A protein has these predicted regions:
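Conserved helix-turn-beta segment immediately C-terminal to the redox Cys motif
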Residues: 41-59
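Conserved strand-to-helix beginnings and helix N-cap segments that scaffold or border functional pockets
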Residues: 38-41, 67, 91
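N-terminal leader/targeting and pre-domain segments
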Residues: 2-18
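Non-catalytic, surface beta->alpha helical segment in thiol-disulfide oxidoreductase systems
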Residues: 81-99
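Structural micro-motif
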Residues: 71-77
Length: 99
């Protein structure tokens, strides 16, 4: 639960509390020329938009450590900073975890 939105209303008023869970943050690791990355981008963007989750994309070629660690495994999806899926992204599973 969050803090009351309107302190003028009684605390037990249904209008005074929000119950929505915070949106997740999804990060997609990609690189140019990766056809699986293009497919994953479509899936991840749609799932994030439909669930109200934040989406960001990181090109692994801009960071030597990411390139070293993930060059053979992209695309990689992180949900809330935790590695979640790689290569062919399962849209149904992603939507389930973001719901």
């Amino acid at each position: 639960m969050s803090l009351p939105r309107n302190p003028q209303k009684p605390l037990l008023s249904a209008e005074n509390w929000t119950t929505a869970a915070p949106a997740h943050h999804v990060t997609l690791l990609t690189k140019d020329g990766c056809h699986l990355c293009a497919d994953a981008r479509t899936v991840v963007r749609a799932a994030c938009q439909d669930t109200g989750s934040e989406f960001s994309e990181v090109d692994i070629t801009t960071d030597a450590a990411l390139l070293r660690d993930y060059a053979n495994f992209i695309p990689v999806v992180f949900v809330d900073g935790i590695p979640w899926d790689q290569l062919r992204i399962d849209e149904r599973r992603l939507r389930d975890v973001l719901s």
